[in-house]
Regions:
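The feature marks non-catalytic terminal segments
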Residues: 1-5, 69, 76-77, 142-228
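Alpha-helical elements of Rossmann-like donor-binding domains used by nucleotide-donor carbohydrate transfer enzymes
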Residues: 27-31, 69-72, 96, 100-103, ...
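A short secondary-structure junction signal
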Residues: 93-94, 124-127, 157-160
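Active-site adenylate/phosphate-handling loop in enzymes that bind or generate adenylated species
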Residues: 100-144
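Histidine-centered beta-alpha loop that forms part of the nucleotide-sugar donor binding/catalytic region
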Residues: 17, 117-118, 150
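Active-site rim/loop-helix segments in enzyme catalytic domains that contact anionic ligands
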Residues: 1-108, 137-141, 226
Length: 228
């Protein structure tokens, strides 16, 4: 797989703990894809192997299903897909995983990255955020970082900005429906309610919430402001 940028376009990375965590940022991803000047990379910390229970984890059937579903979602987005191979429910910011992610950042050199809120109540989310922070330090690649909201899992989330996804919301919900083994249609229904609520805050139909990491922001340079 080509891990570099296509045609000199700026790269944007989406660092997710599991397949289906694009539920927090797919509306933004589609907006970037529509502009045609960004190279999108989805980096999954785990394969979501335990998403159907222990038996489906042990026989590998859940992993296989979730890989296919994520491949379909990334194809819909036109995004490159990368795996870090941590284990769902038993993930850590291990040195080898941080080094693997650092090497990937060095190849991709993203302009911006979307990551999990570091104190999400789901441990896999917080571990992926910790690995991403260490990978930036190891690679010396420091993109603009924005944290996505995972609704009930993002405790004490403070939104610094809302991205209008009115033009991409229906495609986002169709993408979430691809996660059949995780009841993707139900995820889409939950996100629709949350994003209608956020949209009302800024006078649009649907919006996603993001928090900035100020330490990674260059003065006068903000990807999310540029696409408004």
């Amino acid at each position: 797989m080509n891990t570099g940028n296509d045609g000199g376009r700026e790269a944007v990375a989406f660092v997710c703990a599991h397949p289906d965590d694009l539920c927090g940022c797919a509306g933004l991803a589609f907006r970037l894809a529509d502009l045609g000047k960004y190279d999108l990379h989805v980096i999954d910390f785990t394969h979501g192997e335990r998403g159907l229970g222990e038996a489906a984890y042990l026989d590998g059937s859940c992993r296989a299903k979730r890989i296919k579903e994520e491949e379909a979602a990334c194809a819909m987005l036109g995004a490159h897909l990368h795996w870090l191979d941590e284990i769902d429910g038993d993930s850590y910011a291990r040195p080898e995983t941080c080094a693997k992610l650092a090497a990937l950042l060095s190849q991709i050199r993203p302009r911006a990255a979307i990551a999990h809120w570091p104190i999400d109540c789901h441990a896999d989310h917080s571990m992926s955020a910790a690995a991403f922070q260490r990978a930036m330090q190891l690679s010396r690649v420091f993109p603009e970082v924005y944290f996505m909201e995972q609704v009930h899992q993002s405790r004490h989330f403070h939104a610094d900005r809302y991205v209008d996804i009115t033009t991409t919301a229906e495609r986002k919900y169709a993408l979430l429906g691809l996660y059949v083994c995780q009841s993707g249609d139900q995820i889409a229904a939950e996100r629709r309610i949350a994003e209608m609520y956020h949209g009302r805050k800024i006078g649009v139909e649907f919006a996603e919430a993001y928090a900035d990491w100020p330490l990674t922001m260059a003065p006068g340079r903000c990807l999310l402001d540029e696409i408004i």
